[in-house]
């Protein structure tokens, strides 16, 4: 972006200056509305989410057999919700900032099959596509036992079709493993920052991995191009997919059930704050949408991004969405948080969700490494760097009197609050890689 344009952007949005300087930044969204007011802009409804629930239930018998690690939950891919009181104390001590309320962790990092939040959206979209093809071919009815999809006849049928996706890692892992298991031919277009072990794991499942020297945006574009030339190839579009988004949104109802099970209350007097790491936006956007449908105006969602890849904060704050990239303002999009290394946000998610998000913040790679180490020490939970992005949120909210006033929170409400950090990945990181992460924390 030339200097003149850049100066006028900064004049209009002074916060951009802090982003360019790679400062850890927090922006509380003044444009937040009620769910009733914001929902129509999403273009999806409660019914769409219920359809996704129903589809995952239909596939549960299949998943329980195809992936024995899901048998205990009857083929439902869901993660634990745990309190992390020792980490809460450690954060308070390290940052000299009390966190009022209780700190919880949602362990999507340990979801079965692919060990990340992408096991929600990625797997769901592959299943939805497989179902559509099998229904159209007359091989399946909605009331059938879907475990029959494991038969050689179905494998043979699906092998005529292929799937392509562009990814920095975790989405590729989910889609690759699931597609290969169903019988699709699958190609994952990986950006430069994808971890070697993720590529190796995909190849071990018979997935074709195409590597690029450039970033996420290029990998997605190349994947899209490759798929266009083949009528039997389905491209899963992380930047625009409503199906992926709905796969993530199912988490809202599921979390509500977990809260009920644990006797946790969410209402006007007991607000819920949720902190979601954000790359292109599909995962956190879908989850936040589901949470809003489940908890209404009593849940407050925040997106967390690396200082080197603040694409969603930049897009929503300036109102330019996918018309601007972090590279346009001179930021390099290089971060250890490989799952969040995205320079241009999803225009669909930004526009759909901007009224339903309370805020956005950035944090440095070093902050992620530090918190990764503390969590391992205090709670014995090991995550990958990007999964710690949400962990910086509670301090930011508890420290901001202006945010608390904007929403009219009193001391008692904050005392009764639940702070939920969404851990997005790390459950399958190899030991030696994890030790390298741990060595970088302070």
Curated annotation (Swiss-Prot):
UniProt key word Cytoplasm: no
The keyword Glycoprotein is annotated on this UniProt entry: no
Cofactor(s) this protein requires: pyridoxal 5'-phosphate
One biological process term in Gene Ontology: isoleucine biosynthetic process
Family of this protein: Belongs to the serine/threonine dehydratase family. DsdA subfamily.
InterPro entries: D_Ser_am_lyase, Ser/Thr_Dehydratase, Ser/Thr_deHydtase_PyrdxlP-BS, TrpB-like_PALP, TrpB-like_PALP_sf
One term of GO molecular function: D-serine ammonia-lyase activity
Annotated protein name in UniProt: D-serine dehydratase
SUPFAM superfamilies: Tryptophan synthase beta subunit-like PLP-dependent enzymes
Known EC number: 4.3.1.18
Coiled-coil regions, chain positions: none
Modified residues (N6-(pyridoxal phosphate)lysine): 118
Record's keyword terms, sorted: Lyase, Pyridoxal phosphate
Subunit structure comment from the entry: Monomer.
HAMAP family in the cross-refs: D_Ser_dehydrat
Substrates-to-products reaction catalysed: D-serine = pyruvate + NH4(+)
